[in-house]
Amino acid sequence: MDDPKLTFSRQRKYLLFILAVYVLGYGLTAYKTVFLGLILGTVFSLFNFLLLVRRMNAFDRAVEKGKSIRSLGSAARWCNAILAVAVAYKNPEYFHMASTVIGLMTIYPVIMIDSFIQLKRSSMEER
């Protein structure tokens, strides 16, 4: 199994690559509001991912010391998502609402696809 820091670093790199593609889409196409919504949602998704990584590291340290931790910070991530949707709702001339929500969910397919790829790699190495 991979080191969690390597996994998080790889997933962060994938998310930044997707964000760069969205920025190119904003600059090169006529769908400005759609790509701006994707960018907004993905930036908040990246921030939520970084919050999750930070909380998971704190959780690991607490487990090593035999202490308990209250939560993994779901409330903070929900508040960030609500903030992103509120920004898109207040500024529909700049941000497409549906693409903002899609951008917020960008990290989840990245995590799943990365996990699937790593599972395939590890099964290929065992053969």
UniProtKB/Swiss-Prot annotation:
Glycoprotein among keywords: no
Location(s) in or outside the cell: Cell membrane
Keyword Ion transport: yes
Membrane topology type: Multi-pass membrane protein
Transmembrane segments: 13-30, 33-53, 97-117
Gene Ontology, cellular component aspect: plasma membrane; proton-transporting ATP synthase complex
Entry's family note: Belongs to the bacterial AtpI family.
Name of the protein in question: ATP synthase protein I
Species classification: Bacteria, Bacillati, Bacillota, Bacilli, Bacillales
